[in-house]
């Protein structure tokens, strides 16, 4: 059996590697020639534990080949689509998915299995199956099969979670779901649940919308904590001792490819407006601006004009331990303050193009803003770092610092007690 994986990003490349490691012949396809060149050299274009070692192994065995040529996909029995589905405003942009479906239609044979892993609005898999029927003259469930198997992994833990997380597979036809289950069972040790395609689409979107709404509630608690002079993290810890309470963690914002986008995908085909989900999005989207307000307040307390201030932002990724900056609240924060301050410096140990070291980025700075919860930031001696700063201000957007360092003006999201 030959598997083609279309889209070699944060999900597509690890997925291709997993199937190749399971003994399948895999061809990975991406329209970005520079990505293909890098992968062929044995180096992944994304940061993920173990990915380079695993990539080199399957390349050396000849189980994975990558290409930007559509004709190289011919002869594949399975097509797994892992392309992005971004937003255009608040509406889904399915152009990448439709382009991938048209590519599959050019090369697929009878009996092919087409799996969409991309996160999509409810009803999209059915629409793509109809598009394939129109393009090929074949019938889903008879001549080819279409299923939705949404990814459910976290950057930094992708390979482990691909194996051990449970999997939801929805088929346009029952046979499509069964064929996809058999395929994923080659490496998935978690449970696999079968359903129809639209239910599978909704499950993935519900999961991320649940998280987004609950983070918004935690962020609203953090905003209230400032008004009441309370440490929201202490309050949350105590509230969570109740057996039926599990409050999420607030912070500078919600990022990544999924959480800021998926609530809008869930609502995109709805026939009426659902206010709670949209309000939660607005709360999470305002958090970078709230963090900027904390910074300007601290600068004022230190008698520093924003136009004369040098700001060192620690972390650009949307979460700790990854280089993924998609929809990162750190980037939104930088955008908000950039035109109001003298200079914005950035340092992220995982993201290329930032300062070389923490020590260099803070030298002569007036304020530090912690925007990402990288593990490297949790063991920093802030008093020592402060010796090279012009002024000592820290804004903690990720609750990295439990006790404000001596000699600093300290502000933190949800830290109404300081």
Curated annotation (Swiss-Prot):
Binding site for NAD(+): 10-11, 30, 85, 119, 261, 326
Superkingdom as given in the UniProt entry: Archaea
Active-site positions on this chain: 204 (proton donor/acceptor), 258 (nucleophile)
Enzyme Commission code(s) on record: 1.1.1.336
Keywords: NAD, Oxidoreductase
Residues reported to bind UDP-N-acetyl-alpha-D-mannosaminouronate: 152-153, 204, 208, 211, 242, 244, 249, 255, 318-319, 398
SMART domains: UDPG_MGDP_dh_C
Listed GO biological process terms: polysaccharide biosynthetic process
Swiss-Prot/TrEMBL catalytic activity: UDP-N-acetyl-alpha-D-mannosamine + 2 NAD(+) + H2O = UDP-N-acetyl-alpha-D-mannosaminouronate + 2 NADH + 3 H(+)
Gene3D superfamilies for the chain: NAD(P)-binding Rossmann-like Domain (3.40.50.720)
EC top class named in words: oxidoreductase
GO MF assignments: NAD binding; oxidoreductase activity, acting on the CH-CH group of donors, NAD or NADP as acceptor; UDP-N-acetyl-D-mannosamine dehydrogenase activity
Listed Pfam families: UDPG_MGDP_dh, UDPG_MGDP_dh_C, UDPG_MGDP_dh_N
InterPro entries: 6-PGluconate_DH-like_C_sf, NAD(P)-bd_dom_sf, UDP-Glc/GDP-Man, UDP-Glc/GDP-Man_DH_C, UDP-Glc/GDP-Man_DH_C_sf, UDP-Glc/GDP-Man_DH_dimer, UDP-Glc/GDP-Man_DH_N, UDP-sugar_DH
Domain notes: The protomer folds into three distinct domains: an N-terminal nucleotide binding domain, a central helical domain involved in dimerization and a C-terminal substrate binding domain.
Family listed: Belongs to the UDP-glucose/GDP-mannose dehydrogenase family.
Assembly behavior: Homodimer.
Function: Catalyzes the four-electron oxidation of UDP-N-acetyl-D-mannosamine (UDP-ManNAc), reducing NAD(+) and releasing UDP-N-acetylmannosaminuronic acid (UDP-ManNAcA).
Name listed for the protein in its UniProt record: UDP-N-acetyl-D-mannosamine dehydrogenase
């Amino acid at each position: 059996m030959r598997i083609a994986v279309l889209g070699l990003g944060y999900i597509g490349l690890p997925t291709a590697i997993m199937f190749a490691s399971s003994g399948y012949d895999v061809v990975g396809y991406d329209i970005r020639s520079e990505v293909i060149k890098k992968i062929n050299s044995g180096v992944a274009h994304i940061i993920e534990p173990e990915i380079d070692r695993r990539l080199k192994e399957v390349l050396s065995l000849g189980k994975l080949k990558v290409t930007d040529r559509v004709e190289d996909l011919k002869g594949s029995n399975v097509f797994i689509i892992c392309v992005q589905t971004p937003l255009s405003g608040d509406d889904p942009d399915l152009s990448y998915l439709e382009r991938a479906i048209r590519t599959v239609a050019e090369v697929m044979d009878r009996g092919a299995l087409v799996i969409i892993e991309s996160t999509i609005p409810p009803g999209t898999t059915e629409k793509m199956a109809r598009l394939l029927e129109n393009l090929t003259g074949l019938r889903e469930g008879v001549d080819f099969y279409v299923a939705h198997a949404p990814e459910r992994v976290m950057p930094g833990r992708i390979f482990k979670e691909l194996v051990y997380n449970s999997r939801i597979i929805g088929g346009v036809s029952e046979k499509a779901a069964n064929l996809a289950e058999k395929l994923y069972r080659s490496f998935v040790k978690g449970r696999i649940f079968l359903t129809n395609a639209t239910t599978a689409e909704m499950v993935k979107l519900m999961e991320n919308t649940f998280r987004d709404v609950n983070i918004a509630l935690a962020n609203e608690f953090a905003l209230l904590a400032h008004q009441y002079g309370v440490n929201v993290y202490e309050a949350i810890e105590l509230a969570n001792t109740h057996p039926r309470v599990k409050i999420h963690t607030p912070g500078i914002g919600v990022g990544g490819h999924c959480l800021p986008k998926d609530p809008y995908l869930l609502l995109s085909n709805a026939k009426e407006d659902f206010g709670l989900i949209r309000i939660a999005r607005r709360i999470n989207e305002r958090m970078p601006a709230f963090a900027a307000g904390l910074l300007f307040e601290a600068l004022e307390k230190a008698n520093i004009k924003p136009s004369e201030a040098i700001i060192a932002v620690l972390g650009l990724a949307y979460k700790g331990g990854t280089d993924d900056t998609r929809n990162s609240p750190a980037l939104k924060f930088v955008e908000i303050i950039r035109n109001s301050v003298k200079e914005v410096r950035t340092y992220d140990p995982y993201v290329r193009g930032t300062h070389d070291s923490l020590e260099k980025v803070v030298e002569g700075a007036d304020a530090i803003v912690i925007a990402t919860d990288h593990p490297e930031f949790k063991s920093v001696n802030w008093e020592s770092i402060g010796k090279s700063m012009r002024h000592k201000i820290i804004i903690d957007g990720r609750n990295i610092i439990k006790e404000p360092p001596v000699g600093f003006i300290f502000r933190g999201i949800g830290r109404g007690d300081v």
